[in-house]
């Protein structure tokens, strides 16, 4: 089995395609179950965020994974990136460290990678290969963020959106802000807004208790999601980030809200994938809509300022990838030796138990020992004998040469080490 990662992100695919490729809620466990049912796949994990959808798998080949993704979201194959083995390891290390994020060094992605691992493990989709990889990923990401400043004062998508709102409304402290959702992104937005002060903070969520908790922490007012349309006209600024599959804020609703506001401008930030706000809202005069793709341009300055720390983190990742691959290769090299030893031990135990039973039954010791030695020799030598016979028939020189080194003609003979060629210099004496 080969380690593969296939995915798309904010750099390779537009937001509408990322919407279709996303896995949310109950769709994620069902997708993992579907993946594990593929005969070519032994392990799988899915990472799905607003900016990326990635499939990590131990599989025979990549084509079956591409086909599976195409079934989930037709038309995405042209936007996919694909890595295997060491490059797949490097990719996951970079993702978890925040080096592949829209906002360089953002901290949320590590938690999202941990969530992907936990869900895959809880639903039986992980084996020893991917589990080991994810565990090492958490260690590498922690070290990179501790030893460098790549995660220092990170600028998140939420904080970038709040900053844009502050720049657009010179007196944001006199404005009413509506937050839709109560997840991590909205929590961050609420935190930044409460630090900068707003006149009124409304928080609408499907689960009212979650909105009430967030409102109590930041001095806001909680609303059930069913009251969203009624309060939309009150909002000067709207931030939305939910896991809804369909838009929660429509063009018609915003148009009605603008009329009620007497065309007073409204600023909307759609931080969700799939999108929470209909894209056509941006066509309305006095409505200004930003999506996560728009925010990428706003965070580019931050990305440049953190490049030096990122380079240091990249060096740590390069070293850790090399060490991880070396460990895997050593484990792979040891596997045949372990199988050989296990075969020898099980054969010995089986035949020894049989010999002891024969002695217990009164069979002569010499006869039992003779049979034991004969059976042990035949049982242990049968697999290599059969393999060498096939090698000779198929002219497999590599295997027969290896056998010559393993089984020299003279008992006790040790093959000399392979000599290092002598390189003559230009001024060396010519051979006589």
UniProtKB/Swiss-Prot annotation:
Catalytic activity of the protein: (S)-4-amino-5-oxopentanoate + tRNA(Glu) + NADP(+) = L-glutamyl-tRNA(Glu) + NADPH + H(+)
Top-level taxon in the UniProt lineage: Bacteria
Pathway entry: Porphyrin-containing compound metabolism; protoporphyrin-IX biosynthesis; 5-aminolevulinate from L-glutamyl-tRNA(Glu): step 1/2
CDD domains: NAD_bind_Glutamyl_tRNA_reduct (cd05213)
UniProt region (Disordered), positions on chain: 407-432
Documented EC number(s): 1.2.1.70
Pfam families assigned: GlutR_dimer, GlutR_N, Shikimate_DH
Binding positions (substrate): 49-52, 101, 106-108, 112
Keywords tagged on the record: NADP, Oxidoreductase, Porphyrin biosynthesis
Site positions per UniProt: Important for activity: 91
PROSITE patterns, sorted: GLUTR
Chain sites annotated for binding NADP(+): 181-186
Active-site residues, record numbering mapped to chain: 50
HAMAP family assigned to the protein according to its UniProt record, in alphabetical order: Glu_tRNA_reductase (MF_00087)
More details: During catalysis, the active site Cys acts as a nucleophile attacking the alpha-carbonyl group of tRNA-bound glutamate with the formation of a thioester intermediate between enzyme and glutamate, and the concomitant release of tRNA(Glu). The thioester intermediate is finally reduced by direct hydride transfer from NADPH, to form the product GSA.
Family classification: Belongs to the glutamyl-tRNA reductase family.
Function of the molecule: Catalyzes the NADPH-dependent reduction of glutamyl-tRNA(Glu) to glutamate 1-semialdehyde (GSA).
Self-association state and partner proteins as the record states: Homodimer.
Name under which the protein is recorded: Glutamyl-tRNA reductase
Organism of provenance: Xanthomonas oryzae pv. oryzae (strain KACC10331 / KXO85)
